[in-house]
Amino acid sequence: MAATAREDGASGQERGQRGCEHYDRGCLLKAPCCDKLYTCRLCHDNNEDHQLDRFKVKEVQCINCEKIQHAQQTCEECSTLFGEYYCDICHLFDKDKKQYHCENCGICRIGPKEDFFHCLKCNLCLAMNLQGRHKCIENVSRQNCPICLEDIHTSRVVAHVLPCGHLLHRTCYEEMLKEGYRCPLCMHSALDMTRYWRQLDDEVAQTPMPSEYQNMTVDILCNDCNGRSTVQFHILGMKCKICESYNTAQAGGRRISLDQQ
């Protein structure tokens, strides 16, 4: 249920109607940029040609008694609870989802807080099981998702960390896997492909090349380890000699061994 904008005193969201499709809350935000009332900044941004700065919100309106007051967790007039969770920095009101405000991220995150740590180099809160087990890329969270080109850092969609360190929205990652397996930025495998590589080993072994190709070699570059090697050409794939990945690309022309020329 999406909220609609209204000017002060104008008809709009019904009295007592709680929250919107984005948040469960008992108040409307008074946008400091245009003085209109919206349930949340996302509803505002979807309807206006400018963005609401969450940090500049000063006033809210209670959905029950309609009193406009300074931003706080409980209505000073009728004691309506505006949100089980309230951040007086982001002015975020919502039901309790174990949220916490991360000073380094500068915004609120869904917790529990003890399940996450802030990586200073990546500049993002990550799950504890990734601590010391992910590849850091400086300020990677400030880059847009390479699939949808939308913001990742402030997105309400969970970010997925690829083995290469790049980030995608979780939903974009799941869609990407329907079409391919490689990071759209660096071409590194986006998940553990070991089982598939072993299947490909069997297929290559069972598919001999025609005699004129059996002694043909090619230089390859591995997208997974960045190593270079010279291997036998095969139409099904060419396996990196260093890491045994088939995520490779030709780095030079094909050639026939001298003893076969």
UniProtKB/Swiss-Prot annotation:
Induction conditions: Up-regulated during the S phase of the cell cycle. Expressed at low levels during G phase.
Query: What are the BP-aspect GO terms?
Result: error-free translesion synthesis; positive regulation of proteasomal ubiquitin-dependent protein catabolic process; positive regulation of protein ubiquitination; protein autoubiquitination; protein ubiquitination; rescue of stalled ribosome; ubiquitin-dependent protein catabolic process
- How is this chain modified after translation? Subject to ubiquitination and proteasomal degradation. Interaction with PLAGL2 or KAT5 enhances protein stability.
**Which residues are involved in binding Zn(2+) 4?**
C87, C90, H101, C108
Please state the residue ranges covered by RING-type zinc fingers. 145-189
Tell me which residues bind Zn(2+) 5.
C102, C105, H118, C125
Q: Where does Zn(2+) 6 bind?
A: C119, C122, H134, C136
The record places its CTCHY-type zinc fingers at 82-144
Keywords, A to Z? Cytoplasm, Metal-binding, Nucleus, Phosphoprotein, Transferase, Ubl conjugation, Ubl conjugation pathway, Zinc, Zinc-finger
Q: Which reaction does it catalyse?
A: S-ubiquitinyl-[E2 ubiquitin-conjugating enzyme]-L-cysteine + [acceptor protein]-L-lysine = [E2 ubiquitin-conjugating enzyme]-L-cysteine + N(6)-ubiquitinyl-[acceptor protein]-L-lysine
Q: What does this protein do?
A: E3 ubiquitin-protein ligase that mediates ubiquitination of target proteins, including p53/TP53, TP73, HDAC1 and CDKN1B. Mediates ubiquitination and degradation of p53/TP53; preferentially acts on tetrameric p53/TP53. Catalyzes monoubiquitinates the translesion DNA polymerase POLH. Involved in the ribosome-associated quality control (RQC) pathway, which mediates the extraction of incompletely synthesized nascent chains from stalled ribosomes: RCHY1 acts downstream of NEMF and recognizes CAT tails associated with stalled nascent chains, leading to their ubiquitination and degradation.
The molecule here is called RING finger and CHY zinc finger domain-containing protein 1
